[in-house]
């Protein structure tokens, strides 16, 4: 009996040791590594080790659920294949030197809750496909070179809590749908040429107090969710 228990224990440990993410996810990560010059990162990846041991990568139940590579000297572009990380819940690539455009394929990563690519050199328009990220709570795209308008599709992200597009070259108006979201706590649009529509008010945003978000709501906006539009004097 003792030998049998030992055998099962060894088989279990062996299964855990050799458990890996799917080939599709690993391929997407390696594409990403190559396209952002992984060999010159501050902390690189060793492809001969399990993906779970790669710097900044979080694996749960053999699925890649988070990639956090802030301040890691990423240079290059984001490959279309990044959309194959369909189980990803958090993608944090802020403060690197990523260029090119934001791949439309990111709109297929429907488990994403956080997408943060602040302080890079991305350009072009913000893809309409981001409106497919129904679980998205945090969207941070500040200090890039995005142009065009904020996609109207973002007005359908009912779980969005923060939209930060500070310091880009965006124009147009804020999507009307965002004015009706009770979850939205912070809207940062300063240092663009965005026009605030009548559905938004210049108000002060306070910290959340337990379950109550403390907004000062002008009487004319009683029927709407009032959001904070931060100015260039803000540091967040």
Task: List each model region and its residues.
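LRR flanking "cap" motifs
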Residues: 34-77, 236
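Leucine-rich repeat
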Residues: 61, 83-88, 107-112, 131-136, ...
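The feature encodes a structural signal of leucine-rich repeats
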Residues: 78-80, 102-104, 123-128, 147-152, ...
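Leucine-rich solenoid repeat scaffolds
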Residues: 161-236
């Amino acid at each position: 009996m003792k030998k049998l228990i030992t055998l099962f224990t060894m088989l279990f440990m062996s299964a855990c040791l050799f458990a890996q993410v799917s080939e599709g996810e690993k391929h997407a990560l390696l594409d990403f590594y190559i396209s952002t010059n992984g060999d010159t990162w501050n902390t690189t990846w060793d492809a001969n080790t399990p993906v779970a041991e790669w710097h900044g990568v979080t694996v749960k139940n053999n699925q890649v659920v988070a990639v956090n590579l802030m301040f890691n000297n990423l240079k290059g572009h984001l490959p279309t294949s990044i959309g194959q990380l369909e189980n990803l819940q958090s993608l944090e690539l802020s403060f690197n030197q990523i260029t090119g455009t934001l791949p439309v394929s990111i709109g297929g990563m429907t488990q994403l809750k956080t997408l943060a690519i602040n302080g890079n050199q991305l350009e072009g328009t913000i893809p309409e496909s981001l409106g497919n990220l129904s679980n998205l709570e945090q969207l941070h795209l500040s200090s890039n070179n995005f142009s065009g308008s904020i996609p109207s599709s973002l007005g359908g992200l009912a779980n969005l809590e923060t939209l930060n597009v500070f310091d880009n070259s965006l124009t147009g108006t804020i999507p009307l749908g965002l004015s009706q979201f009770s979850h939205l706590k912070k809207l940062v649009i300063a240092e663009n040429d965005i026009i605030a529509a009548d559905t938004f008010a210049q108000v002060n945003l306070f910290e959340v107090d337990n379950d109550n978000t403390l907004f000062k709501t002008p009487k004319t906006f009683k029927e709407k969710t009032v959001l904070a539009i931060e100015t260039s004097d803000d540091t967040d």
